[in-house]
Swiss-Prot record:
GO terms for molecular function: structural constituent of ribosome. It comes from Elusimicrobium minutum (strain Pei191). The keyword Protein biosynthesis does not apply. This is Large ribosomal subunit protein bL17. GO terms for biological process: translation. SUPFAM superfamilies: Prokaryotic ribosomal protein L17. GO terms for cellular component: large ribosomal subunit. Part of the 50S ribosomal subunit. Contacts protein L32. NCBIfam families: L17 (TIGR00059). Pfam families: Ribosomal_L17 (PF01196). PANTHER family: LARGE RIBOSOMAL SUBUNIT PROTEIN BL17M (PTHR14413:SF16), RIBOSOMAL PROTEIN L17 (PTHR14413). Keywords: Ribonucleoprotein, Ribosomal protein.
Length: 114
């Protein structure tokens, strides 16, 4: 009897959800912040924290599966891995930014910690 899947479905199929989270993670690595809904921010935080940890440990093949953009891949390994070398975890922070005017969805800004 399966009780919990351990992640939010976000109203999407598995492949669509995985692609969306990978694209959002790439955007966060490139721009260091993204504005999205709170639920998506909480899910993409897991992906980004895992990517930074893998980059710190030098596991580049697993990171290549997620990041398809060469610029983001290079920035992750050259800039972010050295920036967070001494930090054990918690590489992102989520700030709530109110409600979106169009559909009244709760919006959050997810940033990389300095």
């Amino acid at each position: 009897m399966i009780k919990n899947t351990g992640h939010r479905k976000l109203g999407k199929t598995g492949s669509h959800r995985r692609a969306m989270l990978n694209n959002m993670a790439t955007s966060i690595i490139l721009h260091e912040q993204v504005e999205t809904t709170v639920a998506k921010a909480k899910e993409v935080r897991r992906v980004v924290d895992n990517l930074v940890t893998l980059a710190k440990n030098g596991q580049n093949l697993q990171v290549k599966d997620t990041l398809k953009d060469k610029v983001a891949y290079k920035k992750l390994f050259e800039v972010l891995a050295s920036r967070y070398e001494k930090r054990p975890g918690g590489f992102t922070r989520i700030y709530r930014a109110g409600k979106r005017p169009g559909d009244n969805a709760e919006v959050a800004i997810i940033k990389l910690v300095d």
